[in-house]
A protein has these predicted regions:
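Surface-exposed helix-capping loop/turn segments at secondary-structure junctions
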Residues: 15-23, 255, 335-337, 471-476
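Short Pro-Gly-centered flexible turn/kink motifs
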Residues: 1-12, 328
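Non-catalytic surface loops within mature trypsin-like serine protease
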Residues: 12-14, 332, 425, 603
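Beta-propeller domains with acidic blade repeats across secreted/periplasmic ectodomains
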Residues: 40-448, 456, 464-466, 509
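Terminal connector regions
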Residues: 14-41
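Long, ordered, helix-rich scaffold segments
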Residues: 398, 414, 421-680
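Short intrinsically disordered, low-complexity coil segments enriched in acidic
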Residues: 1-6, 44, 96, 210, ...
Length: 680
């Protein structure tokens, strides 16, 4: 056949590259096409690099002045670590996924995957004790500890593994399959990043190229053993929920699974800031995302489940690095200088580095600005993709460590490291009990921890309080103490923590939440909206208040939560709230609001096209006006659009409607003019 050069490519390889500069030059040259060649260079660099021992790897790394790197744990203590987390005692739990073979192979053949508990008993910054909690569950990819046991993501299941007597050995006969259906097609895009949210739900991520249908298992479900094949089919109790890229959550008491947001690529790493705003880091596509419940986000490939999304929410990052970020963690502790407070830490696989970004509030959301190249491994076989912040305020990064950095093959099965990044002079206060078992503290102390400078302690304390409330063992006066904190504390972040703690312990009535909708703090109002809608059935009193707030609330953050709430109520209940939201012309250029409002309005259009077109005529958000008209045409309701066009006032309004009308007609043939078209 004919061979033709369609674009020039110049490959320059000298063993060491300035990854960020090369990426920017390459994108300018190619118009952002062909950047995959950089992945090839990075993979080649890894395969050709000299293997470094953990000690040599530490010496080879560079870090910001005033900080140090040390190996907290490494082979042979751990191998093939795929996930890690903390427990109430400040011990680190590590999932060794020794069943991983390649992106397309591996499930249970190795048979020796383990869940380890690592401890630094003398607090010298190095793990010195290793306990095997569980062995033989195939393909462990995500872990979280809380509420009496281990929550383990191991496709196809989300398992609860209890340890009722606290002997650090799994009660294997009592393991529960809470969810099933997680896919495994692309083994480095599986269920990952389990993380307790402020609202008592367990959050996680799922990759784009591993389609899954997730739901409650039929009867008790099936727990897989070494040597067994991944199932061709799983059976559900009821229907499953589709997810093929996104953020999800599961409530351990209500036993309910939800997709929080659809899209992305291979999101790995999720965390929330002091206001409870969630962020993820992602691979391949831009790296940083503000996650809003109900959001539909840019996808690396494929189509959205809903064909009427029309446009999706884009990254908040205003810059690019080499692709493949993971492990997002917002620094909310006291060991680092104030400069790092609220910054988001991420590992970067292709840059072999830990990077920080600044989360700058903007409208209803954020702009992610590059802060620092905090730590560079200078080691082409360093594969960091998960991070944690510990009880002492230090930052930890998990290094899968392999000569194949993209997971196509496992070339070094017996390696794995966890590095600690710490200030040479920690600013953390070493108060009495800082490293004690949080689960052994009384409720008074757990409430006090909600004002801690260490978010680690506030969060662990909240999970413990939640567990006590579930068992009916919450001490008398605990809710009263939290209410006092909420009402009297001058720190807005501490008030939010008190609100969350009240919620997870059952201390918030609807009447109290309705009252909080008038709070002076926008984030208190916003979170009260979300909590009132948690069960998808806000009361008539809440709906009336929401409609008023949609018109009158001055905060774009509150309006964002109202837009998100639209998807958690019936179609009939959405109209008044939507009418208030579309009246804010100041939101027309907002990064999130017009699209999120549209996602809530979209199913209303085919349900009542005439009323929807009235909403379009009243809307002061051009995107919403355009999309309502387009959706009406897609629903075959040309007459409704034609009639609205005839009544529309102003050239801009007519132009917005016509754009939607034209887009809806695109590709159609033999379209008959609607009856009113001549008059219009």
């Amino acid at each position: 056949g004919k061979t033709e050069t369609i674009r020039h490519q110049i490959h320059v390889y000298g063993g060491k590259l300035n990854d960020k500069d090369l990426t920017q030059h390459w994108m300018r040259y190619t118009g952002q096409r062909g950047t995959a060649v950089l992945w090839g260079l990075a993979q080649r660099e890894g395969r050709e690099a000299k293997f470094l021992t953990p000690e040599a790897a530490v010496k080879n790394s560079t870090i910001e002045p005033g900080f140090a790197v040390n190996s907290w744990a490494n082979e042979p203590m751990i191998t093939q670590p795929m996930a890690f987390c903390w427990d109430d005692r400040g011990r680190m739990w590590v999932a060794e996924n020794r069943d991983y073979e390649s992106r397309g192979r591996g499930f249970s053949a190795s048979g020796d995957s383990r869940i380890l508990i690592l401890e630094d008993t003398d607090r010298d910054g190095v793990a010195d004790k290793r306990t095997v909690f569980l062995e033989g569950i195939p393909f462990p990819s995500a872990v979280a500890v809380g509420l009496g046991g281990l929550w383990l993501g191991a496709p196809p299941n989300l398992l609860f593994v209890p340890d009722r007597n606290g002997d650090d050995k799994a009660d294997v006969d009592d393991i529960e399959v809470r969810l099933t259906g997680w896919g495994i097609r692309d083994r480095h895009e599986v269920v990952n990043s389990l993380h307790w949210g402020p609202d008592g739900w367990l959050y996680g991520c799922q990759g784009l190229f591993t389609p899954s249908v997730v739901g409650k298992p039929k009867e008790e479900g099936r727990i897989y053993k070494p040597g067994e094949a991944y199932p061709k089919k799983v059976e559900f109790d009821g229907e499953g929920t589709q997810i093929n890229g996104g953020v999800w959550r599961y409530h351990p008491v209500k036993d309910r699974f939800e997709v929080v947001a659809h899209g992305f690529s291979n999101p790995w790493g999720i965390d929330y800031d002091a206001k409870g705003q969630f962020f993820i880091s992602a691979c391949v596509i831009p790296h940083l995302w503000h996650v809003i419940p109900g959001g539909v986000y840019h996808r690396q490939g494929g189509r959205h489940f809903n064909p009427y999304v029309y446009s999706d929410i884009r990254t908040i990052a205003d810059h690019r690095h080499r692709s493949a970020h993971g492990g997002a963690r917002v620094y909310l502790s006291d060991a680092f200088p104030d400069e790092y407070q609220g910054k988001i830490f991420m590992a970067n696989i292709h840059e072999h580095a830990v990077l920080t970004d600044e989360l700058v509030p903007s409208g209803s959301g954020f702009v992610g600005k590059h802060h620092k190249d905090f730590m560079k491994a200078n080691n082409a076989q360093w594969i960091g993709f998960s991070m944690e912040i510990g009880p002492g305020g230090d930052v930890y990064v998990l290094d899968w460590h392999d000569a194949d950095i993209c997971g196509k093959d496992v070339l070094q099965k017996d390696t794995g490291r966890i590095f600690r990044l710490s200030p040479k002079e920690s600013l953390a206060k070493d108060w009495a009990g800082r490293y004690a078992d949080v689960a052994k503290l009384n409720d008074t102390k757990l409430v006090e921890y909600q004002t801690s400078a260490s978010a680690w302690h506030a969060r662990r304390a909240r999970v413990v309080l939640q567990g006590r409330a579930i068992k009916g063992k919450l001490a008398k006066g605990t809710h009263r103490a939290l209410e006092k904190m909420f009402l009297k504390n001058k720190n807005a972040d501490h008030r939010l923590r008190a609100l969350w703690a009240l919620h997870v312990t059952g201390g918030l009535s609807e009447s109290k939440l309705l009252k909080h909708l008038d709070d002076k703090d926008a984030h208190i109002r916003a979170w009260s909206i979300q909590l009132l809608c948690e069960d998808n059935n806000p009361s008539s009193d809440a709906l009336r208040k929401f409609a008023s707030m949609a018109k009158l609330d001055s905060s774009p953050v509150v309006r964002l939560y109202l837009a998100s709430a639209l998807q958690r109520m019936s179609l009939g209940d959405r109209w008044a709230i939507a009418a208030g939201l579309v009246a804010h012309d100041e939101d027309a250029g907002d990064h999130n609001l017009p699209k999120l409002i549209w996602y809530g309005i979209e199913p209303m259009v085919p349900a009542d096209p005439a009323r929807a077109m009235e909403l379009a005529r009243a809307s002061r958000l051009p995107l919403v006006t355009e999309y309502i008209a387009r959706r009406a045409v897609d629903a075959g309701q040309l007459e409704a659009v034609s009639a609205a066009l005839g009544q529309a006032q102003g050239e801009d309004k007519v132009a917005d409607m016509l754009r939607g009308f034209s887009a809806g007609l695109r590709g159609l043939r033999d379209v008959k003019a609607p009856p009113s078209w001549g008059a219009t």
